[in-house]
Each structure stands twice: as structure tokens, then as C-alpha cells.
A protein has these predicted regions:
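Short Gly/Pro-enriched turn/cap motifs at secondary-structure boundaries
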Residues: 8, 25-26, 131, 136-138, ...
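Metallo-beta-lactamase
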Residues: 42-45, 50-51, 139, 146, ...
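Conserved beta-strand hairpin/beta-sheet module of binuclear metal-dependent hydrolase folds
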Residues: 7-61, 168-184
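Short beta-turn/strand-loop junction motif enriched in small, turn-promoting residues
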Residues: 23-25, 75, 154
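Short, hydrophobic/aromatic-rich segments at coil-to-beta transitions
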Residues: 14-19, 144, 153-155
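A short catalytic or substrate-binding loop motif that flags glycine-/basic-rich loops and adjacent residues
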Residues: 2, 27-29, 160-162
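Active-site HxH/HxHxD metal-binding segment of metal-dependent hydrolases
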Residues: 50-148
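Short, basic/low-complexity N-terminal boundary segments at the transition from targeting/disordered tails
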Residues: 1, 11-15, 119-127
Length: 200
């Protein structure tokens, strides 16, 4: 099952699990993905990507259940779309980074989107569709916390490494681990800090 709009494409990879991408990105540009995990009483949007387009409205085409915005970490390619949601859940180590971010205005974000887009898609991009930083509630999550979606429970695992507060979500129902940038071969950006802590 595939669901699309002007900005997003969702592919159902397992029952109730949708991988969300933005297929209009030019080859060679930085990509980011999010996952919508739909239970029987709530859903989780795991990472909000770049903020190009209204991710919340897109998710509401897939489910009418309450959607919890959960971040793997604070970097702008994973959390810039948070501000279209009522609140987000993020590890406290990464909470200060939410507003440091990717872009501060819709115009700045539009310029980034244009720089990323395939030429034939540039005319579709509009400033009013960009998600910009504004006040929102952010709730801390910790290692071992559990999100109960009804037919499945997702457990928070604090892993650090890529950022101080990087987390994974474990879904034992489908034997899936959602990892953000934690399981990557070239993006462990805080390794030096970690070594200093271990040596102290």
C-alpha cells in the first residue's frame, strides 16, 4: 500500500508500519525518512524529517488516531517538522537542540528545499508549506519508557553515539528496531565526547 501527496510518500512495509519518504529530492542530496507506526488506540510518528511540507496533515490521511511525535534525536533532518504537531517526545539530553536547528523561517526552509529538489519539482514548493520553529510542548523520554499503542508496545532505548540523547524504539510485536541515525556507518558524531567520558 502506497499513499502520496505533493511532499510525502508512505509505503506500508509491515501491517500498520509506514516508511515515509520525500521522493522529489535530487540525487546526491541528504535523505531522511520517518516511520508512522499505527496501533489500535494511538500512533507514533518517529522523526519528522526536514520540515518540507505538513507531515501531520499527511499522517492524518493514513490514520485518525492520536499521533505522538517521537524523535530519535534533535538534528534538523529528523526534527525540523516537529512544529506542525502539538508536542514531541525526546530524550532530555537532546531537548536543548530542538530550537537550534535547521532553519528559523519559512523562507529559509524554502530556500533549502529548492536547493534539494529535482528541477521539475521546484515550482511545486511553497513557503507556506514549510514547517518553521514556534512554541510547542516537549516531553522528556527515558531509557525503558514504553509507548502503549493498543495492539503493540514500543520501548525506548537510550543509545547515544550519534547525539547525546539518541534513542531507538523497539517493537517486539514485529521484531523491529527503529534507529534514526544510530545504526549508520558514518554518522557517529559524538564519539570523541564518549571516549573522554569513559576515560574520566
Amino acid at each position: 500500500r502506497v499513499i502520496e501527496d505533493d511532499y510525502f510518500r508512505a509505503t506500508e512495509t509491515f501491517p500498520g508500519i509506514y516508511k515515509i519518504s520525500q521522493p522529489w529530492f535530487r540525487e546526491g542530496t541528504l535523505l531522511s525518512f520517518g516511520f508512522l507506526i499505527v496501533g489500535t488506540k494511538a500512533a507514533i510518528m518517529y522523526d519528522s524529517m526536514f520540515g518540507y511540507g505538513n507531515l501531520r496533515k499527511f499522517c492524518e490521511k493514513i490514520t485518525d488516531l492520536p499521533i505522538l511525535m517521537v524523535n530519535s534525536h534533535f538534528h534538523g533532518d529528523h526534527a525540523a517538522g516537529n512544529f506542525d504537531f502539538d508536542c514531541c517526545y525526546i530524550h532530555p539530553f537532546d531537548l536543548p537542540g530542538i530550537y537550534k536547528g535547521f532553519a528559523q523561517t519559512q523562507e529559509e526552509l524554502l530556500a533549502r528545499a529548492i536547493d534539494t529538489a529535482k528541477p521539475e519539482f521546484v515550482s511545486h514548493l511553497k513557503a507556506e508549506d514549510m514547517c518553521y520553529p514556534r512554541p510547542m510542548k516537549a516531553f522528556p523520554i527515558f531509557d525503558g519508557d514504553v509507548f502503549d499503542l493498543g495492539d503493540r508496545e514500543l520501548t525506548v532505548v537510550h543509545v547515544g553515539g550519534h547525539s547525546p540523547g539518541s534513542i531507538m524504539l523497539l517493537d517486539p510485536t514485529y521484531h523491529v528496531a527503529y534507529s534514526g541515525d544510530t545504526c549508520n556507518n558514518d554518522t557517529i558524531v559524538t564519539w570523541a565526547d564518549s571516549i573522554e567520558e569513559y576515560l574520566a
